[in-house]
Amino acid sequence: NNTARMMLSLAVARLMSEHGNTLFINFETFYGFKGILKDEENENLSDALYAFRQNHNQFHKNIVNAISHYERLDYIPDASCAEDIDDIKPEEIGTFIQAIGRELGYSNIVIDIGDGIRMPWNMMDCCDEIYICETGNYIENMRFKNFEKYLLEQGLDNIAATFKKIQVNEDENINNDDIWGRL
């Protein structure tokens, strides 16, 4: 469920930001960040991906313009164009994330992989921890089991072994303005 995943990823980012320099990036299309973090950003993930595509070696100098701040958390706002996420090659995403961490000195980078990433296991292979939502929803649980089975069949046991399942209870009143305060 996208809402549960969003709530979990933001909660993890918020907790990590209390213990170190943390950047949050989401690859979900039409995420709705503006309504959650209420920050006026100038650039976004589309701009960051464009800078990366133009110059893999020096993009970190331009990406700082796409990073916004909310309390102690740094984040890159939603892509303004869904195709920008879809167009990036799966193997480039890991390079993109690792270069940001290395060049900009983030202790933690929290990624909401979302549905926009093709072959997400390429990015997952770069992650130290992968949090998976458990909502009690039968269909969502079956989707995850099928995904886990696929990883095992493909010999990607190392990725499946890093999954940490977290119970997420969705609040019925998710549309209120204080989502950040309730994470």
Question: Where are the model-predicted features located?
Answer:
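Walker A (P-loop) phosphate-binding motif
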Residues: 1-25
